[in-house]
Curated annotation (Swiss-Prot):
One of its GO terms (molecular function) is methylated histone binding. Double-strand break (DSB) repair protein involved in response to DNA damage, telomere dynamics and class-switch recombination (CSR) during antibody genesis. Plays a key role in the repair of double-strand DNA breaks (DSBs) in response to DNA damage by promoting non-homologous end joining (NHEJ)-mediated repair of DSBs and specifically counteracting the function of the homologous recombination (HR) repair protein BRCA1. In response to DSBs, phosphorylation by ATM promotes interaction with RIF1 and dissociation from NUDT16L1/TIRR, leading to recruitment to DSBs sites. Residues 86-95, 277-288, 407-419, 491-501, 583-599, 640-649, 666-675, 790-818, 830-839, 961-975, 1060-1074 have a biased composition (Basic and acidic residues). Residues 1749-1845, 1861-1961 form the BRCT domain. Residues 1481-1600 are annotated as: Tudor-like. Disruption phenotype: Mice display growth retardation and are immune deficient, radiation-sensitive and cancer-prone. Cells show a slight S-phase checkpoint defect and prolonged G2/M arrest after treatment with ionizing radiation. Cells show defects in the DNA damage response. Mice display defects in immunoglobulin class-switch recombination (CSR) during antibody genesis. In contrast, no defects are observed in classic NHEJ and V(D)J recombination. The keyword Secreted does not apply. The gene is Tp53bp1. It comes from Mus musculus. The modification Phosphothreonine is found at residues 305, 543, 548, 662, 912, 1211, 1606, 1635, 1645. This is TP53-binding protein 1. The Tudor-like region mediates binding to histone H4 dimethylated at 'Lys-20' (H4K20me2). Interaction with NUDT16L1/TIRR masks the Tudor-like domain and prevents recruitment to chromatin. Residues 8-22, 69-85, 101-110, 294-324, 426-442, 481-490, 517-528, 566-582, 614-634, 935-949, 1178-1197 have a biased composition (Polar residues). Keywords: Activator, Centromere, Chromosome, DNA damage, DNA repair, DNA-binding, Isopeptide bond, Kinetochore, Methylation, Nucleus, Phosphoprotein, Repeat, Transcription, Transcription regulation, Ubl conjugation.
Length: 1969
């Protein structure tokens, strides 16, 4: 290859040409093929990179600027150098390569600086220009090096420029100009115009200098004629010129760069071709005057597409990549559609590279076919033409404004176009690509016209590829825009192996924009962990492989494609912006692309193919030939490119790796700069770069502005569908095709992606796929390097690429989870887009578009099949399949899409082997093929079990499509729903289910979207995971390591579940589900009941959505609405569901459980009920998989609700969950749900069983029976009988939204497991709602995902003592209401956790209090180890148990899943107030306001039992339960008017107010609270009373004279449930006015408080229960009772108390009276923990009390709180710990402490005992004994961090300091201990100092006067008053500090070494008294 590259005209061209003969490359042989291919590869990526930036940085469109402001253009041209220098400098700052390039090429660098003004352009152009200025060979080498160094720094651009020299710079400029002209076309966008102008100027300036300097150097050296062409056609030709001088390695580099140039040029040429024919006259004119208008006139559809692509590219990439985009000028048109169709953009860029190749050597001009778009450039780019072009670039500078150079370009382009057959077809294409042509004037006329025409021809013909060579032409001409993009991509690809690496960053001037975009996207891909990038790369690579037959092109192609994908995927954060920006860009494009629409339509189609054709353009000629020839060519070229470009490839790989870094910045910038456009791109790219491009193009076709976006989204959706079709087709495809596809994995994926966007891209996609085959192979050689660099370089190019793809895929899947969110914003676009594309009429394929994308793709494929033959389609299918695998996330949708019936399935038959091959490769690529595996396994599964495999793929779609198809769902809102429904249950019969789903989707959403498309959409619908995305990402990462096949299967099961469910419900929901069940069992029958539910939640969640989708899809409006709602609500609700699905997908087991979920949905009602039971059972699962549990509950709820009001409930499953939950009376629509919840709570301590029977009708509690039995209770179980009315599954509890149905009998059956699962929590019901299903699925992480936000009581907050009741409330907590009564607000979505769904049917939904007994196993562990969210979740579970009582009915009612809110209670009526009718006591069942003893606040609740001794068991509305003294119970409900209360506002802060009114809604009481003159309604739970406020009501409303019943001492009010230390809590509250919520976060009443919305709000943070620091108190300060008793609170350090341990606590008077707390039911509760127990000495307590009183933080409240703290009985605590398998350390033993899983010191307060100090020194957490109490009470391990004791009282700060992890405060300290051994001073402090890290401690007995001490070796002397004077004198002489033990103590308390004289007590002779 190097040699050939050296000989542009020589062997490379010939060999490459011969290799590429089959692909339409021959048609464009004006460029040597080998060189073209190689250059194309780099160029392709470069251009793509630039293109992406263009797409993303639409706003900075120099071309637009030029068009808008010709004067400005001139000025900018004048300023080009300075502007470029500025940009270069900017770029320099970011990209060393650029800066070096700048230095190298003065003029070029100036131009680059100009171009750099747009963000992307700057980086790409800067590099390119700089590179151009370098001598050809020098530059190439430099660029290679720079590529390597500047990958991060726009290395691709640099490489391209460097390698291409002037060609490169010109290419960059050409592209820039082209891009500018395209932007000009889009100049409607003023800012774009300015940017475009700037870019145009830059291009001109760069073109001129480049053409003069670099172009002359590079072009003269390499190929003066080509150079001219390169200059004119996007300095791509310059690159070829560079290639010629830079022979050998340089040639390789150059070819890569030239490819980039070519790509840039081809982009321009595409424009040029169009311009030559249509745009030649209009281009400059239109670019400047009527950019958009000319486009339409030239070729409305294609032009529009290209322009839109370019516009978007310009706008998008204009800022950062505008220059690159401009460089891609010709490509840019394609690029413009690429905004919508990012792949297209890549295509556009590739042509530049290819052009560059052509330019590289005169021969290379012929091989332009490699860069088909570039070919036109190549042909006109004859050696003479190159010279002309060289000059032309300068003219271009002027002409872009004038438009004359554009015509020049057009002429050149026409010539070139005529040269290759494609060009003549592109003649038409150029029209389509006229926008590009317009852009071309901005470019150098030469470079622009030549590549543009062939490329345009290609693009134009793409839509209707009927000839094989014409097919290439179609690719070039028919898909000219595509060609433009493809050429860019191809060239980028070819140049990009080296150039892309460079180009990715900077190298690609023309490519820069695209490449920058590509780079950005690529970098984003990198950011996405190459997830999107590889996938995108795969897509683009696949798309571009054909374009870029040379490995380099392929690699570059892939990289740019990936880059675009990356842009789409990586900028998930940006993606939202991008999505919005894309919308804006699309709007802009709409203006500018009104014209472009038609063109873009064609372009979209073309582009997709073009991308494939870019590298495949050479191979495109005949589908089969192309496949084989391309395969061989690609293989050869891969080898050649690999060899030739190995420096480059090493570069490429290196650069590619770096590229992600540089592009990351660029990309990130890009997405941000062009977020709107970027988003569609992101989505598209995420799904598949080619798809993205296609989408963008298609969208412009239909509706340039919106259509593009829509297309992108649609493609995303379509992609999945098509992917399915492709997968199926691939399965059916010949093994050869499969192999091809395998080698073309990315290309296949792209095809898949594109196929989803077949409407515009369908015809393109087949070409693409054929090309992708070639590209795939090329890519394997080159792209793999780049991609591997980006991802993980594979050793072999193919392996590399595949592995990269795999990595990309896996990462994409993981990232997609992340990206899911970002794609989400585009989702709306997608939703709109489907309409737009449908509306727009992608003329030949409008119907197809509207019709299932798969069908569209099929038609397109068929179209292409004619010209390209089935082989092309087969290639496409394999490519798609491969790509599918590569892009697990984004491609999954495609896989789903592809398999649609009647679509491309037949052609894709041969794709099956690629799927398998890709699967094989995928694992390589990604160690954890979770996302990847999904694809590969999906593919394999597809082969083996189509439906399952489809499902599998669909699941990846979940992951991938979450990001990609998520937008697709917006486009295809209905499709999304359909798809999703299908996926969970279509595991077995996924296809049919998918189809069923899709058909409705097709009819409703996409018109043409088949079931697969719908399923994709459906699957994506859950994708809305803005909040869940993070969880998804985290959990994916956590679970993504699940077995690949399992994840796939899970995905399959799961996703199909959604579709199946959708189908099943509409068709034969029960039957289908049942039938599916057997298949699903694959997933996990782990918990047939629970797993079903487990899966059920997700599947049901999805299913409900999907059902709704399938139901609604029947009515497009409804479905759309639902889709939108689902998008929004599902975003929250589906977020968890999707997350669950995704994660399960990654965790094969989990997904399979989801399948079970499908199984659970066997009977919808059963499923719903199952979900309910799952909820109950889910508790146990919840523990393990709280997240899933939540999802399950929500899913179940959604499913159940869905039947009633599928659109509303499911759509707003979150809404429903949140709202319905708290409006539990509301039955699901149409459901008459009779549910009987029997909650049996067995209180071990009381040995009294209170059986509460709550009867619900439609979720409304109609009857409550409380039976009290005095048996020895063993556990709390909940039995739920639910009659679900015929209404769909489980409308059992309307208010639950069918969640009750979930908890119905299934719930009851699951209650046991739930209990087990929640063992500690006891709140199976509430948490169970989500947990049950989780259990089945491997969704431990998911549980975490859905874990309650800590806010509710969160893990730590959740005082286990109330853990049970917490379970119910925590569920609410998990909803976002946690802090407030809001919880109930039905704001499941509020829960950012992705638990939105779950919030609605939170465990309490299931009402599975039953499992209150459930052990703390999963949840318990989660609590301590999991994130706060998980803990919150855990909390939810615990709360459920207690809640079970109070929310017994509530559970059916969804139990205020948001939080234990009054509304829920109100809704539940007596349900909330657990045994409303008490057995025996007249007060039982009364609603009261009672004091939570731990924090002194009064909360609303109900008396459930008369415990005796003046105490009553109270169930608080927030689910907490405890015994309260009668004196602390106020019989005032509602709270009387004009009473001062404390209300928790939505901001989660409590503030005082006055009750001014009451009102009841749905049984929930609301207070009108007046605060500061403003009145606001608060839920009952949000209104509490401070101690003072409550005391005011005691006299009148106190519950009798019970206050005397128990001692008033601190322990008096304390109940086991009130164990949390009030002080800590209160202090917490003090710190933030949050109040009990915060307090709840603190262990004091964390659960309860957290549960209570007020407390919950603060609870969200799950603030630690910090006994010590008053500052930390969040709950409102509780004033009032001060106790003389010493509080465990802060211990004053006033006097040093000997650290010796006191044997016992100072017994507290009420210790005996106070319940100590139960022994843990869970016999392994504390397993793995080692405990040290110590008690505060009397002096500690006195000191603490004095400090509290006197200290700054001292307050009566704190003391009061402490009084409320449960008494500490050391012996009993030891019993509790031992009963829970805890290990008690009798003495501090560091070795033993280290061997334990966790060593804790249990104490009643911070103290000054030896153990306490040793633990402070060693960093062992000191935990309050309340933690033990709470953990035992909840039977679940609480988060000890919420119970941490303070380190102690700081003398210096005069306050109690919190415990902080500390290590070695005495690090390396050499200490001399001197004492007379009083209080064992020497040994004690020696041990403490050594434990604290002291280097050495020497003990010196004061009485040992005869011993001499060498004080000089010590750092400090620690002594006591017994220190001998001699030692003191010696120390004074040595200036050795002499301190007392207090200094050591203070160091321990502060956690670091402190000053020796900071306090008088540090004096050794200080006497405390």
């Amino acid at each position: 290859m190097p040699g050939e590259q050296m000989d542009p005209t020589g062997s490379q061209l010939d060999s490459d040409f011969s290799q590429q003969d089959t692909p339409c490359l021959i048609i464009e042989d004006s460029q040597p093929e080998s060189q073209v291919l190689e250059e194309d590869a780099g160029s392709h990526f470069s251009v793509l990179s630039r293109h992406l930036p263009n797409l993303q940085m639409h706003k900075e469109n120099p071309v637009l600027d030029i068009v808008s402001n010709p004067e400005q253009s001139a000025v900018e041209q004048g300023d080009s150098n300075s502007s470029f220098n500025e940009h270069l400098k900017e770029k320099k700052a970011s990209d060393p390569v650029e800066s070096s390039h700048l230095g190298t090429s003065g003029s070029i660098s100036q131009v680059i600086e100009r171009l750099p003004q747009p963000n992307r352009t700057s980086s790409a152009l800067a590099v390119t220009v700089e590179a151009a200025s370098l001598p050809e060979e020098e530059k190439e080498e430099e660029e290679l090096e720079e590529e390597k160094e500047g990958v991060g720094a726009n290395a691709p651009g640099a490489d391209s420029l460097a390698a291409e020299d002037s060609a490169s710079s010109q290419l960059g400029f050409g592209v820039l100009e082209l891009s500018q002209s395209q932007d000009v076309e889009e100049h409607t966008v003023p800012y774009d115009v300015n940017q475009e102008h700037l870019q145009l100027v830059t291009t001109n300036s760069g073109s001129s200098p480049l053409s003069d300097v670099d172009a002359s150097t590079a072009i003269k050296c390499e190929e003066q004629p080509t150079e001219d062409i390169a200059m004119i056609e996007q300095p791509s030709k310059d690159i070829p010129v560079t290639v010629q001088p830079g022979k050998g390695i340089h040639v390789v580099e150059e070819q890569n760069l030239p490819l980039v140039r070519s790509e840039d040029r081809p982009s321009s040429p595409q424009v040029s071709v169009a311009a030559v024919e249509t745009k030649e006259q209009v281009p400059a004119r239109e670019l400047l005057e009527e950019g958009p208008q000319v486009q339409p006139s030239s070729e409305p559809e294609v032009s529009s597409t290209q322009e839109d692509l370019f516009d978007q590219s310009s706008k998008t990439a204009s800022d950062g990549c505008s220059t690159p985009s401009r460089e891609e000028g010709g490509c840019s048109p394609v690029s413009t559609p690429a905004t919508t169709l990012q792949l297209l953009q890549l295509s556009g860029q590739k042509p530049l590279v290819q052009e560059s190749l052509s330019t590289n050597s005169s021969d290379l001009v012929a091989p332009s076919p490699d860069a088909f778009r570039s070919t036109p450039f190549i042909v006109p780019s004859s050696p003479t033409e190159q010279g002309g072009r060289k000059d032309e670039p300068m003219d271009m500078s002027v002409i872009p404004v004038g438009g004359e150079p554009f015509q020049k370009l057009h002429d050149d382009e026409a010539m070139e176009t005529e040269k290759p057959l494609l060009p003549s077809q592109p003649a038409v294409s150029p029209q389509a690509s006229t926008p590009v042509s317009r852009s071309t004037p901005v470019f150098t006329p030469g470079s622009l016209p030549i590549p543009s025409q062939p490329e345009f021809s290609h693009d134009i013909f793409i839509p209707s590829p009927s000839l094989e060579e014409p097919s290439d032409d179609v690719k070039k001409g028919g898909g000219l825009h595509s060609s433009s993009l493809t050429v860019e991509c191809s060239k980028t690809s070819e140049s990009e192996p080296k150039n892309f690496t460079d180009d990715l960053g900077l190298s690609m001037t023309g490519d820069s924009c695209k490449l920058m975009l590509s780079t950005s996207e690529y970098s984003q891909s990198s950011k996405m962990e190459s997830l999107g990038s590889p996938r995108t790369e795969e897509d683009r690579e696949n798309t571009q492989i054909d374009d870029t037959e040379p490995l380099s092109p392929v690699s570059n192609s892939k990289l740019p494609a990936d880059s675009e994908n990356v842009l789409v995927t990586p900028s998930q954060d940006d993606q939202v912006e991008m999505s919005q920006n894309v919308d804006k860009a699309k709007e802009d494009e709409t203006e500018d692309r009104g014209d472009c629409k038609g063109r873009e339509d064609a372009v979209a189609e073309d582009v997709c193919i073009d991308l494939t054709c870019d590298s495949g353009s050479q191979a495109v000629p005949s589908p089969a030939t192309r496949s084989e020839a391309l395969s061989s060519v690609l293989d050869q070229e891969e080898a050649m490119d690999t060899k030739e470009h190995h420096p480059e490839e090493g570069f490429s790989g290196s650069e590619v790796e770096e590229v992600p870094e540089t592009p990351c910045g660029s990309h990130r910038e890009e997405p941000k700069e062009e977020p709107m456009e970027s988003i569609p791109l992101h989505l598209s790219l995420t799904e598949t770069q080619s798809e993205a491009l296609c989408l963008q193009k298609e969208a412009p076709k239909e509706e340039c502005p919106e259509a593009m976006e829509v297309e992108t989204s649609v493609i995303s959706i379509d992609s999945p569908q098509k992917l399915q079709v492709l997968d199926q087709e691939l399965e059916h495809k010949d093994p050869d095709t499969w192999e091809e596809a395998t080698s073309e994995d990315s290309s296949v994926v792209i095809v898949d992606v594109k196929e989803p966007s077949p409407r515009a891209d369908v015809s393109c996609e087949p070409l693409e796929e054929v090309e992708k085959c070639s590209d795939s192979q090329s890519w394997e050689g080159v792209a793999p390097e780049e991609e591997p660099c980006a991802e993980n370089r594979l050793d072999t190019p193919e392996e590399k690429r595949i592995e990269c793809d795999g990595d990309s895929k896996a990462e994409t899947t993981e990232k997609d989870a992340v990206t899911e969110d970002s794609p989400q914003p585009p989702l709306p676009s997608v939703r709109d887009e489907p309409v737009r594309p449908d509306q727009e009429t992608q003329q030949p394929q409008v119907q197809e578009k509207e019709s299932p994308v798969t069908v569209d793709a099929e038609v397109a494929d068929d179209k292409q099949l004619g010209p390209e033959g089935a082989c092309q389609q087969l290639e496409k299918a394999p490519a798609c399949a491969s790509q599918s695998f590569c892009e697990s996330s984004s491609e999954t949708p495609f896989h789903f899409t592809l398999p649609k019936e009647g679509d491309i399935i037949p052609p894709l038959t041969g794709a099956t082997p690629p799927l398998i091959g890709h699967l094989k490769l995928e694992p390589k690529r990604h160690s954890t093929p979770i996302g990847i595996s999904n694809y590969p396994e999906s593919t394999i599964a597809t082969s083996d079990v189509t439906s399952e495999s489809m499902v599998e793929i669909n699941d990846p779609l979940l992951g991938n499509e979450k990001g990609d198809s998520e937008s697709a769902p917006e486009m295809d809102g209905k499709l999304s729903l359909k798809m999703k429904l299908v996926s969970p249950e279509t595991e077995a019969s996924e296809e049919s289910l998918q189809f069923s789903l899709e058909k409705p989707t097709t009819a409703e959403r996409k018109n043409g979207s088949t079931a697969i498309a719908e399923p994709v959409a459906s699957l994506q619908k859950p994708v809305p995971v803005f909040g869940c995305i993070y969880e998804a990402q985290q959990e994916k990462e956590a679970q993504s390591e699940a077995p690949p096949s399992a994840p796939d299967r899970a995905n399959l099961l799961h996703f199909p579940s959604a579709q199946e469910e959708d189908k099943e419900r509409p068709d034969v929901t029960p039957k289908l589900r049942q039938s599916e069940q057997p298949v699903k069992p694959v997933g996990p029958v782990m918990d047939d009941a629970a797993p079903e539910d487990s899966a059920s939640p997700v599947s049901q969640q999805r299913a409900s959505q999907e059902q709704r989708a399938s139901q609604e899809p029947f009515s497009p409006a409804e479905d759309v609405m639902e889709t939108d709602l689902l998008e929004g609500l599902a975003a929250n609700q589906d977020r968890p569901s999707k997350m669950l699905m995704d994660r399960p997908t990654q965790s094969n087991i989990g997904i399979q459980t989801v399948d079970h979920s499908l199984c659970a949905p066997e009977t919808v009602s059963a499923a719903t009920q199952t979900v309910k039971s799952v909820c109950e059972q889910g508790t146990s699962t919840a523990e393990q998989n709280s997240g899933k549990q939540d999802a399950t509950v929500q899913t179940e709820r959604g499913s159940g609700e869905k039947p009633a009001s599928a659109p509303v409930d499911d759509t707003e499953s979150l809404h429903s969950q949140g709202e319905e939950e708290f409006e539990m009376p509301q039955p699901p629509h149409g459901h008459v749900l009779h549910r009987h919840m029997r909650t049996i709570r067995e209180v071990r301590t009381l040995v009294t069983r209170v059986i509460t029977d709550v009867y619900y009708v439609d979720g409304t509690e109609v009857e409550r029976k409380v039976t009290e039995e005095t048996e020895e209770p063993i556990v709390e179980c909940q039995e739920c009988e639910t009659e679900v009315s015929p209404s769909q599954t489980g409308g059992s509890s309307g208010d639950l939204g069918d969640i009750s149905s979930f908890s119905s009998k299934a719930s009851s059956s699951h209650h046991t497991s739930s209990g087990t699962s929640l063992s500690a929590i006891h709140s199976s019901g509430s948490s169970g709602r989500g947990a049950g299903p989780l259990k089945g699925k491997a969704s431990g992480t998911e549980a975490a995902d859905f874990a309650l936000p800590s806010s509710r009581g969160g893990p730590g907050k959740l005082s286990p003592r109330k853990g049970i009741s917490q379970t119910g409330a925590p569920v609410c907590e998990e909803d976002g209401d946690a802090g407030l009564g809001i919880r109930q607000g039905g704001k499941a979505p509020v829960t950012p956790r992705g638990r939105g769904r779950r919030g609605r049917p939170p465990s309490r939904t299931t009402g599975t209090r039953e499992t209150v007994v459930s052990g703390p196993l999963g949840v318990e562990d989660i609590s301590p180890s999991m994130s706060p969210d998980d803990k919150s979740f855990t909390r939810i579970m615990p709360r459920v148990p207690d809640s079970t009582k109070r929310t017994d009915a509530s559970s059916s009612t969804l139990r205020r899943s948001d939080s234990p809110e009054i509304p829920f209670q109100a809704a539940t009526g007596s349900s909330d107030g657990l045994d409303s009718s008490s057995s025996g006591n007249s007060f039982v069942g009364l609603r009261v306001v009672a004091k939570w003893s731990s924090n002194g606040y009064f909360y609303s609740g109900k008396i459930t039992r008369d415990v005796g001794a003046g105490k009553y068991k109270l169930l608080f509305d927030d689910g907490y339960e405890c015994d309260v003294l009668g004196k602390d119970i106020l019989l005032c409900d509602p709270i009387p008017l004009d009473t001062e209360v404390t209300a928790l506002s939505e901001d989660e802060y409590f503030s005082a107010g006055v009750v001014k009114g009451h009102r009841k809604e749905s049984g929930e009481l609301y207070y009108s609270i007046e605060k500061e003159g403003q009145r606001k309604w608060y839920k009952r739970m949000a209104v509490i009373l401070s101690l003072e406020q409550g005391n005011r009501l005691r006299e009148q409303y106190g519950l009798g004279p019970y206050e005397a019943v128990t001692p008033l001492t601190k322990a008096a009010d304390i109940s086991l449930d009130n164990l949390v230390e009030g002080k800590r809590k209160r202090r917490s509250n003090i710190s933030s006015p949050v109040t009990p919520t915060a307090a709840s976060s603190s262990s004091t009443t964390p659960t309860r408080k957290a549960t209570e919305s007020p407390r919950a709000s603060t609870g969200v943070p799950s603030g630690k229960r910090k006994l010590p620091t008053s500052e930390e108190e969040r709950s409102p300060a509780k004033r009032g009772r001060k106790s003389a008793t010493v509080k465990p609170g802060t211990v004053g350090a006033a006097e040093f108390v000997s650290p010796c341990e006191t044997g016992d606590n100072i017994g507290e008077p009420s210790v005996l009276e106070e319940p100590r707390g139960p022994l843990p039911l869970n016999k392994t509760l504390f397993l793995g923990y080692a405990f040290l127990l110590t008690m505060a000495t009397t002096s500690d307590k006195l000191a603490s009390r004095s400090k509290l009183l006197d200290g700054p933080t001292g307050s009566s409240e704190e003391e009061e709180e402490f009084l409320e703290i449960p008494p500490f009985n050391k012996q009993y605590t030891e019993c509790q710990l031992r009963a829970g398998a805890g290990y008690i350390l009798e003495d501090f033993n560091e070795a033993q402490c280290n061997t334990a899983y966790q060593c804790l010191l249990i104490a009643d307060q911070h103290c000054r005992t030896r153990k306490y100090f040793l633990c402070l020194a060693s960093g062992i957490p000191c935990v309050s004994h309340v933690w033990v109490h709470d953990s035992c009470h909840a039977n679940q391990l609480q988060n000890y961090r919420n119970y941490l004791l303070p380190a102690g009282y700081s003398l210096e700060e005069q306050r109690i300091l919190d415990w902080q992890p500390r290590e070695n405060p005495f690090q390396n300290l050499k200490v001399l201990l001197v004492s007379d051994q009083q209080q064992n001073f020497l040994e004690l402090w020696s041990e403490i100092l050594m434990t604290g890290g002291a280097a050495s401690v020497k003990q010196h007995h004061s009485s040992a006067h005869n011993k001499d001490i060498a004080l000089g070796v010590f750092d400090v002397v620690v002594t006591d008053p017994s220190c001998p004077a001699s030692v003191l004198k010696c120390a004074e002489a040595l200036q050795l500090p002499v301190v007392s033990q207090e200094w050591v103590i203070q160091c321990l308390i502060v956690g670091e070494r402190i000053g020796f004289k900071q306090h008088p007590k540090y004096k050794h002779d200080y006497v405390s008294h």
